[in-house]
């Protein structure tokens, strides 16, 4: 939360493994950039270890990319590459690894302008109706969580409690302020 409270924007640059707490730290930044490096891997694999994301991942990821996509990432624990993370909305840009320094500086200059910041926000909020249908009201969250629970039970037969607990945490806290969740 200290990172979020800084009086200036922050940028997380992801070039390699960004899993678990690393992604949760990146999610606390204002902007995220990933490289197209084949070793770039972004995800929350905690459920594969029998635990749930504990440093804000269950709160920040659904707010950023929407509940259905976040549930898919969190409940499976499977990481994605930089391009897929961009497509999902986890990162704001994906840059070639060999030109990362130049492209990151270019992105920083871009978001200094009001037009650049607005373009990033428009991309993040490009589907407000879909977000409302799946997460921005209590009934939508309940329906989305019930569908996810049904799919999870089919897949795991209830033998893996961590994904079920992660789902429960998200379902109970997503409508609350970030600090309360």
Give the residues covered by each predicted segment.
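Short helix- or helix-capping micro-motifs
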Residues: 61, 69-75
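Short glycine/serine/threonine-rich phosphate/pyrophosphate-binding segments
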Residues: 19-27, 54
């Amino acid at each position: 939360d200290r990172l979020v409270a800084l009086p200036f924007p922050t940028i997380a640059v992801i070039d390699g493994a960004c899993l678990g707490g690393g992604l949760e730290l990146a999610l606390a930044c204002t902007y995220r950039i990933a490289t197209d490096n084949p070793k770039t891997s972004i995800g929350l694999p905690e459920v594969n270890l029998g635990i749930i994301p504990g440093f804000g991942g269950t709160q920040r990821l659904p707010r950023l990319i929407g509940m259905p996509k976040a549930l898919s990432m969190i409940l499976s624990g499977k990481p994605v590459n930089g391009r897929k993370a961009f497509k999902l909305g986890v990162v704001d840009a994906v840059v070639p690894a060999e030109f990362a320094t130049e492209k990151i500086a270019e992105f920083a200059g871009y978001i200094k302008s009001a037009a650049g910041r607005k373009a990033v926000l428009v991309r993040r909020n490009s589907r407000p109706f879909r977000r409302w249908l799946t997460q921005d009201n209590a009934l939508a969250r309940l329906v989305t969580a019930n569908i996810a629970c049904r799919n999870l039970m089919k897949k795991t037969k209830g033998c893996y409690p961590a994904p079920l607990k992660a789902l429960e945490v998200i379902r109970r806290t997503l409508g609350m302020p970030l600090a309360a969740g």
